[in-house]
Amino acid sequence: MSNESSKKQSSKKALFDPVSFSKDLLAGGVAAAVSKTAVAPIERVKLLLQVQASSKQISPEARYKGMLDCLVRIPREQGFLSYWRGNLANVIRYFPTQALNFAFKDKYKELFMSGVNKEKQFWRWFLANLASGGAAGATSLCVVYPLDFARTRLGVDIGKGPEQRQFTGLGDCIMKIAKSDGLIGLYQGFGVSVQGIIVYRASYFGAYDTVKGLLPKPKETPFLVSFIIAQIVTTCSGILSYPFDTVRRRMMMQSGESDRQYKGTIDCFLKIYRHEGVPAFFRGAFSNILRGTGGALVLVLYDKIKEFLNIDVGGSSSGD
């Protein structure tokens, strides 16, 4: 009895090891910050294409015709550095988001995967991978949503100078919305975000870990193979969850506005479908696929940084 109780206590300590948890935060956060900065211009193009129909700054005749049109007009109309508008907020938001996703993903995995044999219980093992990814994404979203909201609003602010800008920065955006709409204004679109993030993270983490777990030697997987797997996973996950992302960002655009275009999430889905058609749900999706390269780099860099920090990569990536 004493041996069993000591084993349970030691397993609990291992489950909440602060050193391992901190290393997870560092590895995921650094990888995320680097990749997001690299693809920031594409990120902004994607946001503008998604929400321009709901933006009061962009008149119908001035809307972007597509990704290339947007890429050309941004520096011409707003200046070259505006490609990175909202990037600082994105890095600040993305560091804890991705770090918490990865850190909690491994902790949730230890909870879900306990006693599961990959060889004998493959589908249970696969579902556990999906559940750990979805739970990690939903948990982190609850914490950082106001930063995600502010990043979106800053990224789609198309004014050229301070006098034409809706917000002057991250702090100004949060304060203005909180003052006009209260805390709930910073969580506009939160419900559909949770739905989308669970779909995205479940496939993003679950599929990546599952595919890597099927490889003969997960720890010795070549960089190129890991990158290709990650690229396919991020692309498929992004397309699958993209309509949810479009709706949530349209909902975000309503905070601080007296005249609201949508009554709620369902109304937003219906109005986009009726007035703009199915393609509207996927505006900016190609930009999102290109942006997904950054997400693929995050997954691969995360494993490499964990190796550098002497964290057991096999336990987190293979699902063993």
Curated annotation (Swiss-Prot):
One of its GO terms (molecular function) is ATP:ADP antiporter activity. Specifically expressed in undifferentiated embryonic stem cells and germ cells. Expression is down-regulated after embryonic stem cells differentiation. In adults, only expressed in developing gametes in testis. In testis, expressed at higher level in spermatocytes. Expression is probably associated with entry of the male germ cells into meiosis. Expressed at very low level in Sertoli cells. Disruption phenotype: Male mice display a significant reduction in testicular size and are sterile, due to impaired spermatogenesis. Males show increased levels of apoptosis within the spermatocyte layer of the seminiferous epithelium, accompanied by the absence of spermatids and spermatozoa within the seminiferous epithelium and lumen respectively. Early meiotic arrest: an accumulation of leptotene spermatocytes, a decrease in pachytene spermatocytes and an absence of diplotene spermatocytes are observed in spermatocytes. GO terms for biological process: cell differentiation; male meiosis I; mitochondrial ADP transmembrane transport; mitochondrial ATP transmembrane transport; regulation of mitochondrial membrane permeability; spermatogenesis. The keyword Membrane applies. InterPro entries: ADT_euk_type, Mit_carrier, Mitochondrial_sb/sol_carrier, Mt_carrier_dom_sf. Residues 51-87, 144-191, 245-284 are mitochondrial matrix. This is ADP/ATP translocase 4. The gene is Slc25a31.
